[in-house]
Amino acid sequence: MLIFQQQAFALPSYARQTGEACVACHVSFPELTPYGRLFKLSGYTLGTTQLFPVAAMAVASVSKVSNTQGNDSSYPRNNQLQLEGGSLFIAGKLGDHAGMFSQWTYNNLNSTTQADGSTAFNGKTTVDNNDWRLSWHLAKADLDLIYGLTLNNNPTVQDVWNSTPAFGYPYQSSRLASVWGIGPQATLIEGGLAQQVAGLSAYAFLNKNWYAEIGSYRVADGPFSFLSHGVDLSNRLSGNNPYLRFAYNRDWGMHSLAVGVFGMDAKVHADGTDTNSPLDHYHDRGIDMQYQYLSDPHIFTTQLSYIHESTDWDASHIGNDRATANSKLNSFRAKASYWYQHTYGLSIGYFGEHGTTDWTAWSNTGSPDTTGYILELNYMIKPNWRVGLQYTGYTKYQGASLNYDGNGRNARDNSTTYLYTWIAF
């Protein structure tokens, strides 16, 4: 499973609802400020109800892989201007205690592999991230409690800190890189269940310091199928699967700090198309940290996360795509950003995957280990219009820096330059 495919945007519909500028809620999209976190935890209910809480966005880009090794057909649309697609959002206050974030996305770079090995592109519209909330606020002299329920379709999409996977860095990345099969391996909670599940959680935020959330996820079918509309259930859950999140938050002066833990246990059918197929058991545990210095004109933010995944594989895998009945995968992410006047941005990121040696799963090197870095420059033409230049460099790929595939391809050959622009309206 590959990562670096999430996209997230600030919504003009929320700005119209609250009467606030985009920078009130966001450091840089989608990094939330303390006010933005309270807005989300309050169920998107701050402000006045809008008759049409609708917004949209569009993305165009150019992606260039470092080296095709003369095999250009394996990297279709390399170094070509592309309209990636766009999204429609229904997002805003539904009532005093109810609000929503619902995204539907048209992917113009949706691809399929043909019988002759070529790649065909065909646009496709599917459901994207959804977060529907009920919330209440209890305020007294010595007590400030926000509590509520969230129904969502992507574990951690409901989180208000940008150190967990769904809204973690990179916030924008090349869709073509995933078409080309380029990207680090990922734990299940890092997007493996996105738009395939329905989760219900109860949460509470006490005195703007302590956050707790307990929930459960199941497959998004039957009455919940709208949460997976158009998406293949490649990782079909069995039964109810617990999710936990705890964090400590402190805001003082221009500073904001949060540290937390999160985790999920998941029973996943070995064959997503067969509800009678055997089950694989995933155990994902994460720790995370976020720090923000929110001044004017200087802003600095950083996020860290570490996820440990242990997977118990059904016996049907052994000798086929796995050598052992249990494997482990560790994922580390770090990112730091600097913004000047909310207009000029620089971000530096690091990613590392380290897993169990398995010569059946990784026949060339025996290892999924992948490491690399991300450098990104941003310019905000307007508060709702961004231009970005991003470089993702690989120092190790699937267990090796050199000749990782046995055919002479090196890790650095997968490094990708990504020039993009997006606009929300």
Predicted region positions:
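The canonical Cys-X-X-Cys-His
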Residues: 20-29
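Outer-membrane beta-barrel "beta-signal"
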Residues: 21, 379, 409-425
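Outer membrane beta-barrel
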Residues: 33-34, 41, 54-62, 76-222, ...
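Gram-negative outer-membrane beta-barrel proteins
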Residues: 62-68, 108-114, 140, 155-161, ...
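Detector for outer-membrane/organellar transmembrane beta-barrel domains
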Residues: 256-375, 379, 391
